[in-house]
């Protein structure tokens, strides 16, 4: 890369101060409103069944391009975009009646060989850990925003206040990094719950650490590949983001072994929320009572690997706390929750109340931590670079609130999704209530994230992104979004899962 252009690129994403949380909430609300419109179209009109070319186009427009437009063309007027999306949803809602029963997806043809297995599936009881459409949608929406932002940030059409801040402040991309980790924590609860239900004997910690390290190897390899690619191509870098050598794949790769250690601690402190807050508190105390904060932010970079990568190394504590907070939420919302004395309606109400209370608690802790709060708050600014306690609380509060909103939309539009007595009928209702594109992004989230990184690098090496005008930027971003969506759908159609996470 040309040295002058590289310097311009690095300056373009450096020294930024971010924007307001209210604006970030308004922009991300577009994802929820788009899902609401999709759900109204499907629940009232069965618009996406069968999945025609028109259905694919509208699905792409609502669940991918709406987010792209919210962060670019409508970045200064996100509320207007929300209004444009919610208006047709309300119009359809008021002018149509809810069908008595959801329209069933067309079942695949049965072969003679598969007939016996399909018959068993048709009469089998639903799983105790069901697939939740709202959880699929939440995770996919987060992934769509992340993939769009990592390329859009290199164009001038993407506001600088949405890009990652230098030291202190909040931004859309700062929130996206933490949300990626939080969502990973949410879905990680499924394996933990499954082992509890099966009553399988817990392996010794040493064996679990070895197994989790094996699980981490693909992520660490991806981190090394990214490191050598960036250095080898002389690619523009934002060193204060993670350090000289560290990158986000290393953070993701180191999470599983550390989570296993805290799983062992959970037998003593049976609350992942407490463990999460405990890590955040201890890390914040270390930042405030020692020279650690100044060492991370302003100390000259020495020759040691620790000094060169201090942001990535020390911020890992914050990301671990975020992951455990997500795991705590997953434990609460993934189980079916029904019993002889609790109906599906009561179980769903319980999930909504739990998410609402959790969102309120995390938000209260965040306000007390990051503002004066009428003289009672600590007024500590948010720092993604440090991944300090206010950052952990902000990410946890936002994601819990997002889950609450998506769960509420599903409850209102598809109330019968889990009111079934067989796996087959429940599977049909889950498919009916889930966007094909969102299912695809959720199924191969890490692989799509990797593809997005590769395409981002290819685009930046091919064109001068910071010199592109609005039309050129939008054309490139729509093409890029189409490619990652197409690949996600192709993998989903072929029932291929490339990487775990």
Curated annotation (Swiss-Prot):
Pathway: Glycolipid biosynthesis; glycosylphosphatidylinositol-anchor biosynthesis. One of its GO terms (biological process) is GPI anchor biosynthetic process. The keyword Acyltransferase applies. Pfam families: GWT1. It is a multi-pass membrane protein. GO terms for molecular function: glucosaminyl-phosphatidylinositol O-acyltransferase activity. It is found in: Endoplasmic reticulum membrane. Residues 101-122 are annotated as: Disordered. Its main location: endoplasmic reticulum. Its EC number is 2.3.-.-. One of its GO terms (cellular component) is endoplasmic reticulum membrane. The chain crosses the membrane at residues 21-41, 53-73, 74-94, 133-153, 168-188, 249-269, 311-331, 351-371, 389-409, 446-466, 471-491. Glycans are attached at residue 198. It comes from the Eukaryota. The keyword Magnesium does not apply. InterPro entries: PIGW/GWT1. Probable acetyltransferase, which acetylates the inositol ring of phosphatidylinositol during biosynthesis of GPI-anchor. Belongs to the PIGW family. PANTHER family: PHOSPHATIDYLINOSITOL-GLYCAN BIOSYNTHESIS CLASS W PROTEIN. This is GPI-anchored wall transfer protein 1. It comes from Aspergillus fumigatus (strain ATCC MYA-4609 / CBS 101355 / FGSC A1100 / Af293) (Neosartorya fumigata).
